[in-house]
Swiss-Prot record:
UniProt gene name: cdhE2
Cited PROSITE patterns: 4FE4S (PS51656)
Gene3D superfamilies xrefs: 3.40.50.11600, Dihydropteroate synthase-like
Cofactor: record remark: Binds 1 [4Fe-4S] cluster.
Pathway named in the protein's UniProt entry: One-carbon metabolism; methanogenesis from acetate
Catalytic activities: 5,6,7,8-tetrahydrosarcinapterin + methyl-Co(III)-[corrinoid Fe-S protein] = 5-methyltetrahydrosarcinapterin + Co(I)-[corrinoid Fe-S protein] + H(+)
SS bond list: none
Quaternary structure, from the entry: Heterodimer of delta and gamma chains. The ACDS complex is made up of alpha, epsilon, beta, gamma and delta chains with a probable stoichiometry of (alpha(2)epsilon(2))(4)-beta(8)-(gamma(1)delta(1))(8).
Domain 4Fe-4S: 1-60
MF annotations from Gene Ontology: 4 iron, 4 sulfur cluster binding; iron ion binding; methyltransferase activity
Binding site for [4Fe-4S] cluster: C18, C21, C26, C43
Protein name: Acetyl-CoA decarbonylase/synthase complex subunit gamma 2
Any GO BP: acetyl-CoA catabolic process
Taxonomy, superkingdom: Archaea
Length: 470
């Protein structure tokens, strides 16, 4: 994105404040364009009226991310990769979390293919209020047989809505897979110095994204990308090679940095998403599968942190997948807006009028930790999330985001009446907010009980202190 101010975007808008975009003014709409919550297509006059055509074209150029965004697959589970504007998250944010594709091979039994595909599709890990999922299936042509590969591709797409990558350096094999996957917008892997012409023709014929590959050869990689772009292929992914150990790993890491830095700094010929292949850990001569899986996770972590937009992985063991999806979720959290839950009164279990009332902040990690500690120990209660702008208890209490007035306001907005909805007229507050006890008692005219410093101690605390003494 070559502009970062709503004022700069505003110059290219109709400036009529018609409201057709859903915003009250064109300046408000310009703000949505800058933070990427809105698109130029949301402005009907800009799209429909010919007099704005030049402004629209220029605005689209200015708003385009420095790294091209590429879409793989179709429908709700389509995977968007790339689309970044910065090298460091704190300067804006990272967009389009690293996508993780897990492999199947066409020489596996059909039943084994189906089982693995369903395992990939059904993977779900609840974390801080959302489900973390896997993103797609990479189908490897281990047999190098077009017919066998086509059968495997057919079996995969019959059993999942996830996007797929067709993996082979043999154009005939890729063509067989493309025939089966028509309309699914698969990613082709890959074009190299030997097959680039044939694979490029396939990408154009079937209108699908394609990977260009040159192992540890950035000049060759750039040449391939430039050649494909000049041929009219827009959706390109870069594979500089992923060496799993030693100097090769160091070179791989350096190549990722060079590619992304060049793209962000304006070299459009190489400003494309980057593919990492942590599954090369299984080719590093590590005999023990647990150790190989561990090293694959290490590689995944390295390239999640440093510019890997899409990854090919193998191990489906929980000890491998959990850290991979957790790290990606953490790195791609938007620093401009802390992860928060709605500020309201929540029921934990099946609370009654005799159940305890507690509050915490609306920082998602804090809320779900407290809620989990209560629910897992069978404590039925009322739990209020106070709006602290997504800040945890200790920091919010110290910084003024958590005050007695904020707590009172949260109770009032929730519609929960401590005098009529419960029989005990008591509130349990976090131990880290003990300093607020007196103020809350004065503001709410209730009995305030100071809970433990850590929500993990709530079960023991409840046994000793609940119900409150009259």
């Amino acid at each position: 994105m070559k502009i970062n101010s709503p004022l700069e975007a505003y110059k290219y808008l109709p400036q009529t404040n018609c409201g057709e975009c859903g915003q009250p003014t064109c300046m408000a709409f310009a703000s949505t364009l800058i933070d990427r919550s809105g698109k130029t297509t949301d402005c009907p006059p800009l799209i429909k009226e010919k007099k704005f055509a030049k402004k629209l074209a220029e605005l689209d150029r200015l708003l385009a991310p420095e790294i091209r965004q590429v879409t793989i697959g179709v429908g709700e589970r389509a995977a968007n990769i790339g689309g970044d504007d910065v090298l460091y998250r704190h300067k804006l944010t990272f967009f389009n979390k690293t996508k993780m594709f897990f492999d199947v091979a066409d020489n596996m039994d059909e039943a084994a293919i189906v089982e693995r595909v369903k395992k990939i599709s059904d993977y779900k890990k609840f974390y801080v209020g959302r489900n973390l999922l896997l993103d797609g299936v990479a189908i490897r042509a281990a047999s190098n047989d077009p017919a066998k590969f086509a059968t495997a591709v057919k079996k995969v797409i019959e059993n999942t809505e996830l996007p797929v990558i067709l993996c082979s350096f043999n154009p005939a094999v890729l063509k067989a897979g493309l025939e089966v996957a028509k309309g699914k917008n698969p990613l082709l892997y890959a074009a190299n110095k030997d097959n680039w012409k044939e694979v490029g023709e396939l990408a154009l014929e079937y209108n699908v994204p394609v990977v260009v590959s040159a192992f540890n050869d950035l000049d060759g990689l750039k040449t391939l990308a430039k050649t494909f772009a000049e041929a009219g292929i827009k959706d390109i992914v870069l594979d500089p090679g992923t060496y799993p150990t030693g100097k090769g790993l160091k070179d791989t890491f350096t190549n990722f940095l060079k590619i992304r830095r060049a793209g962000i700094m304006g070299d459009t010929e190489i400003a494309y998403p980057i593919m990492a292949m942590p599954l090369t850990a299984w080719m590093a001569g590590i005999a023990d599968p647990v150790s190989a899986s561990y090293w694959e996770t290490v590689l995944s972590s390295i390239f999640t942190i440093r510019y890997g937009d899409i990854m090919l992985l193998h191990s489906m063991e929980p000890y491998a997948t959990m850290p991979e999806v957790h790290l990606a979720e953490t790195i791609y959290t938007d620093p401009r807006s802390p992860v928060a839950v709605d500020s309201k009164m929540y029921k934990v279990g099946n609370p009654t009028a005799d159940s305890p009332v507690l509050f915490t902040t609306n920082f998602a990690l804090t809320y779900y930790t407290v809620e989990s500690d209560l629910a897992s120990n069978g404590i039925d209660c009322w739990l209020l999330a106070v709006n602290t702008d997504g800040i945890g208890v200790e920091a919010a209490a110290a910084g003024g985001q958590l005050t007695a007035d904020k707590v009172k306001d949260a109770f009032e907005k929730s519609g929960f009446d401590l005098k009529s909805d419960v029989t005990h007229n008591s509130v349990v507050i976090p131990g880290l907010a003990a300093r607020l006890q007196g103020d809350i008692e004065d503001k709410l005219n209730v009995k305030v009980m100071v809970g433990p410093m850590d929500s993990g101690r709530l079960p023991g605390w409840m046994e000793k202190n609940w119900p409150p003494k009259k």
